[in-house]
C-alpha cells in the first residue's frame, strides 16, 4: 500500500507559484478599457513623448485619438474580428493604431518594417490583413500585393511618388474621424486583440492569438496589486526603445505603462548617444532593455559623460543576461535596480519577473530571470519523460494561466504540440527553480549542444566570451563532429581597435570550463545575426556552417 501511495505521489505535478499573493484581475474588461480604467487620475499628464520631435500627448489626447482612429478604421470597412497590419517603427501612430483597433474589436498583427517584401506579404496573407498602416518608405513592400488583393494602405507620412499618393490614404483619414461615430461592439474576453508572429519552439513563424483577457491578465500580473511585481507609477518615465512590433515592448512597456499612468518616451531605434541624451533630458526612471543594448551600455566609453542618476529600474528580457554583464551595467546606473524577466510570445508573454522591481522588493541573485508571475503556475519537466522535477533540477519550463495564448492561428496541430490537454504551455526552454523560488534559464531545448551525450549550453559559453575585453559580441552553436556528435564553435565580433586570435580565445575559455565545453573553432564575423527581440539567430549561423567552411580570420 505504501509503495502505491509513493508511486501516486510521483505522478503529481510539483507546481511553483509567485511569492506574491494572487490578486483580483478584471478579466471581463476589453484591453483598452483596462488600460484606461484609471485615466481620471492622470488624464492631463504626459502619456506619449515623441523622442524625435519632443511632441507630447497627454492621456486624454491618447484616449481621444485612439477612439477617432477606431472610428476611422470602421468607416474604411474594418469590422469586429477583422485584422489590420501595423508595419511601423516605434511612433505615436503605432500606439493609436493598436488601441484604435482594440476599441472596435479588431485585431492587430505587428510586422517588422525591416522585413523583406516577401516576409511582410507572407504575414499579411497568413493573418488575412484587410488594411496595412505603414510609412511612405515602406509602401513599395506592400503596394503591389495590396492592389491585387483589395487591401487598403494608410501611410503616416507622405508617400514616395504622386502615383502612390493617389492610391494611398493618409493617417489623418483616421485621426480626423468623429469619435462619437465609433461603433459600439460587445467584446468577448476571449476575443483576439493582438496577433504577433513567432516560430515557437520549432518551425516556421505562426500567428499567436493573444486575447483581451490574456493581455489584461499579463499586464495585471506585472503592475497591479498593493505590491506590484513591476512597480510603476504616474511619475515614472519609461524609455520605449525596444520595437513595439515585439510583444515584450508592446506588453511590458506600452501596456504596463498605460495601466500605471506613466510617461512613455518613444525612441525609433537604438543609437547609444541619442539614447543617453534622451535619458538625461527626460529623466527616464525605467529602462526596459535587451542584452544587446545592455552590452552596448557596458562596453561604451561615452556613458560616463551623461547623468543617468534618474534611472531607478533597469530590466532586461528576451534573452539570458550573464552575471558578468549584469555587474558591468550596474556600474553605469548608480541608482538603479537591475534584474531580468523571462517571456515567450506564446505565454502572453511574461512568465517570470524579477522581484527586486516590486514596490516592496525582495533580494535576488545575479543571473536569475525572476520568479513566476502571480496568478499563474509553473512547473519544470523532464524533456524525455514529461515527469515534473523538484527544485534545482534543470528541465523544460512549463506555464499555466489565463495569460497564455489562445493558440496558433489556423494551426491546431502546432497548438496541441505547445499546449497540452491540462493547459500547460511547453516553452522549449531549459531551466530550474532554486530554493528561493528564483528561475534560472540554462538554454533553449533545441539549442543545447550534445558532446558525446554531455549537454553544453551555448549561453554559458557566450557569457564567458563577453567578459573578454577584445570581444564585443559572440554566439556559440553546434558543429557536427564524427567522434563527438557535436562540438561547440564560436562566432566572435572583435572590439574596435582590438585584436585577438583563435588560439587565444580557445585558451581563454579552456581555463574556465570542463573539457567537453571547450570551443572547437572560432569564426570572426562583423556582426552576430539577431532578431529584433535581441535573441541570437542561431539557425542562421548553423546554416552558414553547413553551407561552407568559413575562414577563421
Curated annotation (Swiss-Prot):
Pathway: Phytoalexin biosynthesis; 3,4',5-trihydroxystilbene biosynthesis; 3,4',5-trihydroxystilbene from trans-4-coumarate: step 1/2
Record-listed ATP binding positions: 198-202, 206, 340-341, 345, 429, 444, 535
Binding site for (E)-4-coumaroyl-AMP: 248, 252, 318, 340-341, 345, 353, 446, 450
Residues annotated for CoA binding in this entry: 269, 452-453
Keywords: ATP-binding, Ligase, Magnesium, Nucleotide-binding, Phenylpropanoid metabolism
Cofactor(s) this protein cannot do without: Mg(2+)
A biological process from GO: phenylpropanoid metabolic process
GO molecular function, one term: 4-coumarate-CoA ligase activity
SUPFAM superfamilies to which the protein is assigned, alphabetical: Acetyl-CoA synthetase-like (SSF56801)
Chemical reaction(s) catalysed: (E)-4-coumarate + ATP + CoA = (E)-4-coumaroyl-CoA + AMP + diphosphate; (E)-4-coumarate + ATP + H(+) = (E)-4-coumaroyl-AMP + diphosphate; (E)-4-coumaroyl-AMP + CoA = (E)-4-coumaroyl-CoA + AMP + H(+)
Enzyme Commission number, as recorded: 6.2.1.12
PROSITE patterns linked to this entry: AMP_BINDING (PS00455)
Region feature SBD1, mapped onto this chain: 271-340
Region (SBD2): 341-408
Domain notes: Both substrate-binding domains (SBD1 and SBD2) are involved in the substrate recognition, and are sufficient to confer the substrate specificity.
PANTHER family: 4-COUMARATE--COA LIGASE 2, LONG-CHAIN-FATTY-ACID--COA LIGASE
Family to which the UniProt record says this protein belongs: Belongs to the ATP-dependent AMP-binding enzyme family.
UniProt function note: Carboxylate--CoA ligase that may use 4-coumarate as substrate. Follows a two-step reaction mechanism, wherein the carboxylate substrate first undergoes adenylation by ATP, followed by a thioesterification in the presence of CoA to yield the final CoA thioester.
The protein's name in its UniProt record: 4-coumarate--CoA ligase
Protein's gene: 4CL
Amino acid at each position: 500500500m505504501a509503495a502505491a501511495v509513493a508511486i501516486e505521489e510521483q505522478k503529481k505535478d510539483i507546481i511553483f507559484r509567485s511569492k506574491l499573493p494572487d490578486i483580483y484581475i478584471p478579466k471581463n474588461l476589453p484591453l483598452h478599457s483596462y488600460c484606461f480604467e484609471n485615466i481620471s487620475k492622470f488624464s492631463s499628464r504626459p502619456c506619449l513623448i515623441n523622442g524625435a520631435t519632443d511632441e507630447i500627448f497627454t492621456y486624454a489626447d491618447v484616449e481621444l485619438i485612439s477612439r477617432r482612429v477606431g472610428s476611422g478604421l470602421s468607416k474604411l470597412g474594418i469590422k469586429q474580428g477583422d485584422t489590420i497590419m501595423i508595419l511601423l517603427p516605434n511612433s505615436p501612430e503605432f500606439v493609436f493604431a493598436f488601441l484604435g483597433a482594440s476599441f472596435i474589436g479588431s485585431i492587430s498583427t505587428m510586422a517588422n518594417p525591416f522585413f523583406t517584401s516577401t516576409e511582410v506579404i507572407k504575414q499579411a496573407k497568413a493573418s488575412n490583413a484587410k488594411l496595412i498602416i505603414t510609412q511612405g518608405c515602406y509602401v513599395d513592400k506592400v503596394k503591389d500585393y495590396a492592389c491585387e488583393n483589395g487591401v487598403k494602405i494608410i501611410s503616416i507620412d507622405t508617400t514616395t511618388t504622386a502615383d502612390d499618393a493617389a492610391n494611398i490614404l493618409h493617417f489623418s483619414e483616421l485621426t480626423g474621424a468623429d469619435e462619437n461615430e465609433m461603433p459600439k461592439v460587445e467584446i468577448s474576453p476571449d476575443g483576439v486583440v493582438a496577433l504577433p508572429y513567432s516560430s515557437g519552439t520549432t518551425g516556421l513563424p505562426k500567428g499567436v492569438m493573444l486575447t483581451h483577457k490574456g493581455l489584461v491578465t499579463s499586464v495585471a500580473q506585472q503592475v497591479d496589486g498593493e505590491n506590484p511585481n513591476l512597480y510603476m507609477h504616474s511619475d515614472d518615465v519609461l524609455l520605449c526603445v525596444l520595437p513595439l512590433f515585439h510583444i515584450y515592448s508592446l506588453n511590458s512597456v506600452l501596456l504596463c505603462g498605460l495601466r500605471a499612468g506613466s510617461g512613455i518616451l518613444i525612441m525609433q531605434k537604438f543609437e547609444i548617444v541619442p539614447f543617453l541624451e534622451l535619458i538625461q533630458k527626460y529623466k527616464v526612471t525605467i529602462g526596459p532593455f535587451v542584452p544587446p543594448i545592455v552590452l552596448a551600455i557596458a562596453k561604451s566609453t561615452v556613458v560616463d559623460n551623461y547623468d543617468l542618476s534618474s534611472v531607478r529600474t533597469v530590466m532586461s528580457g528576451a534573452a539570458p543576461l550573464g552575471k558578468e554583464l549584469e555587474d558591468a551595467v550596474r556600474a553605469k546606473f548608480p541608482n538603479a535596480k537591475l534584474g531580468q524577466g523571462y517571456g515567450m510570445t506564446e505565454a502572453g508573454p511574461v512568465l517570470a519577473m524579477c522581484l527586486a522591481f516590486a514596490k516592496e522588493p525582495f533580494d535576488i541573485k545575479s543571473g536569475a530571470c525572476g520568479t513566476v508571475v502571480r496568478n499563474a503556475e509553473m512547473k519544470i519537466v523532464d524533456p524525455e519523460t514529461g515527469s515534473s522535477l523538484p527544485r534545482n533540477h534543470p528541465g523544460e519550463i512549463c506555464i499555466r494561466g489565463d495569460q497564455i495564448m489562445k493558440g496558433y492561428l489556423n494551426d491546431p496541430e502546432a497548438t496541441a504540440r505547445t499546449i497540452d490537454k491540462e493547459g500547460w504551455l511547453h516553452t522549449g526552454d531549459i531551466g530550474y527553480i532554486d530554493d528561493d523560488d528564483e528561475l534560472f534559464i540554462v538554454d533553449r531545448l533545441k539549442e543545447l549542444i550534445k558532446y558525446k551525450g554531455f549537454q553544453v549550453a551555448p549561453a554559458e559559453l557566450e557569457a564567458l566570451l563577453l567578459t573578454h575585453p577584445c570581444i564585443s559580441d559572440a554566439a556559440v552553436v553546434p558543429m557536427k563532429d564524427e567522434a563527438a556528435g557535436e562540438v561547440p564553435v564560436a562566432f566572435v565580433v572583435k572590439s574596435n581597435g582590438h585584436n585577438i586570435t583563435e588560439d587565444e580565445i580557445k585558451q581563454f575559455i579552456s581555463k574556465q570550463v570542463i573539457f567537453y565545453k571547450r570551443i572547437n573553432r572560432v569564426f570572426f564575423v562583423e556582426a552576430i545575426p539577431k532578431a529584433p527581440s535581441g535573441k541570437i539567430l542561431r539557425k542562421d549561423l548553423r546554416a552558414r556552417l553547413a553551407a561552407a567552411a568559413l575562414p577563421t580570420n
